[in-house]
Design a protein with these regions (language model features):
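Histidine-centered active-site/metal-ligand motif
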Residues: 25, 43, 210
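N-terminal pre-P-loop "Q-motif" helix
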Residues: 18-37
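P-loop (Walker A) phosphate-binding loop of NTP-binding proteins
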Residues: 44, 74, 260
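Generic enzyme active-site microenvironment
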Residues: 41-42, 205
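SF2 helicase/translocase NTPase motor core
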Residues: 8-21, 49-56, 61-242, 246, ...
Length: 265
């Protein structure tokens, strides 16, 4: 089965800088984002991913496919991203996070601006994104699901006389998850923050998405290159947010972009 090919030659980009004309592969990539659901833009550096993502967000909003796009980009590139976005769409209404916006005293106010403002796009850094939590209930549900999956895998290994080493590894994973759940319950975020779900974001664009690898995986295999049973917190946070967007958009709300899509951890 050949994957569907997308043709963006027909798209009329309203509000785009008339001095810029997008290349064919860029137009086709935008068509893929608009009509093809969750998308990975895995072009080499210099292929124009920034313009692809900006135009995808503007067209999606214009066509009523989304209301608010959030761009998550490397911390040092937020200003550059905003400049390129405005070069392509001079009248775009952007909200760009500065470092001080996520200091404890200012974070709630900034998140309220995201939630209440009618922006074409909000641009924040990778580390700032992590500081907007999913609701406590959703985080609890995700960890509990992982515990249940791990327990089921342990039972299956025991029933099939699996290796002791694998069972011990799984038990260790279960304990780690239970500790994580206890910590979540004791923290329960006392500082009354606005949660990710309350932002009103219904499309997420992640630049340099390869930084979000090492996601937790329940697996009975061991020592397999690229399979991680230890977890990077930022990756589990990203995964939870993507799952939420899948729920509210039917699997059409997430766009990842990277020049290096595959690398062993």
């Amino acid at each position: 089965n050949r994957p569907r090919e997308y043709d963006g030659s027909h798209i009329h980009f309203v509000g785009m800088n008339p001095e810029i004309s997008l290349r064919e592969h860029q137009r086709n990539a935008i068509a893929h984002v608009l009509y093809g659901g969750n998308t990975l833009l895995a072009h080499e550096v210099g292929a124009g991913k920034t313009f692809e993502m900006a135009a995808s967000a503007m067209e999606a909003k214009r066509l009523g496919l989304c209301q608010k796009s959030l761009f998550v980009v490397p911390n040092h590139l937020t200003e550059q991203w905003a400049a390129e976005f405005l070069h392509l769409y001079p009248n775009a209404k952007l909200l760009v996070a500065r470092k001080k916006d996520f200091e404890t005293a200012n974070r709630k106010k900034f998140c309220a601006r995201i939630a209440t403002g009618d922006y074409d796009a909000v641009i924040i850094g990778h580390s700032q994104f992590e500081r907007i939590p999913l609701s406590y209930e959703r985080q609890e549900r995700i960890i509990q699901e992982q515990i249940d999956e791990t327990l089921a895998a342990i039972e299956e290994l025991k029933a099939n006389a699996g290796e002791n080493f694998s069972i011990k590894q799984m038990e260790k994973t279960r304990k780690t998850l239970e500790t994580k759940l206890e910590k979540l319950r004791s923290d329960a975020r006392k500082d009354d923050v606005i949660t990710f779900e309350q932002l009103g974001v219904d499309r997420l664009f992640v630049d340099e998405s390869h930084f979000y690898k090492n996601l937790f995986l329940t697996t009975k295999m061991r020592n397999v290159a690229g399979l991680s049973t230890s977890e990077a917190q930022k990756s589990s946070d990203m995964f939870g947010k993507c799952r939420y967007l899948d729920e509210i958009t039917g699997g059409r709300g997430v766009v990842f972009a990277t020049g290096t899509p595959v690398s062993n951890s």
